[in-house]
């Protein structure tokens, strides 16, 4: 049985402007990877490691799974916060957030650009099956919103409040669906509008729903 964690996906920009997507089992906790990923520690960790950097550079150039497997076999990098074996290589952000990111089980998503500037997003799942008696199932992949978090002095500001705010919103919306005020589609539309209003001009909101695909 897989140990519960604080799961995250990380998209690393490649020299060809595409992305490699990696998984971290604990990377969403306190959005720690925004601090822990650096050019010297591309997969996180407590200390700089040249082998990890060489592995990262080689993976950034890989174009086939065979190359990935060979590079991983040949490079003895230490264990790290981010799984070194990529889930997918040479893809786009759009593909990751619509086809790979699980908005229920992945608590965070990071985009690491070529200069190692990192954008951290919290995930908000639109599924209401745990908040409504009349909804039995909702997809978890490609069905939610990504929301940036404000930072001050290296720490996320208002992260816990924002998560609680969205949980409370879902509880209210789920009840409104049960009362016939909203259809499931109208419920998602309402949640999107509330997120946009809360974000204002400070935060970035990215929304993906199955209807869009």
Task: Show the residue positions of the predicted features.
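Acidic, polar-rich N-terminal leader regions of halophilic archaeal proteins
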Residues: 1-213
């Amino acid at each position: 049985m897989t140990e519960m964690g604080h799961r995250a996906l990380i998209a690393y920009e490649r020299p060809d402007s595409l992305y490699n997507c990696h998984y971290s089992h604990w990377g969403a906790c306190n959005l720690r990877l925004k601090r822990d990923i650096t050019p010297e520690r591309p997969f996180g960790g407590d200390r700089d490691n040249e082998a990890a950097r060489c592995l990262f550079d080689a993976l950034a150039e890989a174009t086939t799974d065979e190359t990935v497997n060979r590079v991983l076999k040949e490079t003895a990098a230490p264990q790290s916060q981010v799984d070194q074996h990529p889930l997918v290589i040479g893809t786009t952000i759009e593909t990751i957030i619509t086809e790979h990111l699980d908005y229920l089980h992945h608590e965070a998503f990071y985009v690491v650009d070529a200069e190692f500037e990192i954008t951290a997003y919290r995930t908000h799942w639109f599924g209401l099956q745990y908040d409504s008696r009349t909804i039995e199932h909702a997809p978890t992949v490609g069905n939610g919103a990504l929301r940036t978090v404000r930072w001050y002095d290296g720490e996320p500001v208002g992260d816990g409040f924002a998560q609680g705010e969205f949980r409370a919103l879902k509880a209210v919306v789920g009840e409104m669906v049960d009362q016939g005020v909203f259809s499931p589609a109208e419920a998602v539309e309402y949640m999107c509008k509330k997120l946009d209003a809360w974000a204002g001009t400070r935060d970035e909101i990215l929304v993906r729903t199955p209807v869009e695909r």
